[in-house]
C-alpha cells in the first residue's frame, strides 16, 4: 500500500523530489480546475458574464499544465524506469491529468452557456437543478483531489459511489425540464442551454469518478475501472461483497 512516506524512501533524493514535484503539479492543476468549475456554475446561476469569460480564459492555462505534467511523467519514466508503487503513481498522474483537462473543458462549456443566457437576458427554468447538482459535483471533484493528496482509497470509493446519485438526479432533472419545455414551447431555447449545462455537470461527475478509481489503483494496486460498485467496495475494503455478483443472484446486479 502506498502513502505519502513512500515518496521519500528512495536512495536518490532527486528521485524523491521529482515524484513529489509532479504530484504537487497535478494537485495544483486540480485546484485550478476545481475553481474553474465553481466559477462556471456561479456565473451561470448569477448571470455573471464577466466571470464566465474568466473561466474561458483559464482553459488554455489548464491545457498547458496538462502538457507540462505529461512531459514530466515521460521524463521520469525514461530516466528512472520506476517500478511497483512508483510506476502506479506516474500512471495515475498521467491519466488523471486527462480527466482534469476534460473537466476544464466541461466548465468552459458551462461558461459559454452562461454567456449565451446573459445575452438573452432572461433567467430560464432549471437554475435550482443547476445549483443542486453543481454543488454535489463540486464536492465530488474536491473529494477526488483530496483522496489523491492523502492517498485515501476509502474517500475515493465514496466519490465513485456518489456518481450514481449524480446520474440519477441528472435524469430526474432532465425529465422535469423536458416536460416544462413541452408546456411552454417559448422556453425551449433557454431551457436547452440549461440542459446542456447539466449534461456538462454530469460528465464532470464521471471524470471525478475516473480520478477516484485511479486513486484506488494507486493505493491498492488493483485496477477497478469497469467494476460494479459492489466489487469495487470489496476490493477497497477487503470484504466478500462481490459474492452475489459472482453467483449472479437475481436482483443483485450492480450498475456501474
Swiss-Prot record:
Keyword terms of this UniProt record: Cytoplasm, Phosphate transport, Transport
Highest taxon, organism lineage: Bacteria
Keyword Mitochondrion: no
GO CC aspect terms: cytoplasm
Pfam families found in the cross-reference section: PhoU
Role, per record: Plays a role in the regulation of phosphate uptake.
NCBIfam families the record matches: phoU_full
Name listed for the protein in its UniProt record: Phosphate-specific transport system accessory protein PhoU homolog
Source organism per UniProt: Pseudomonas putida
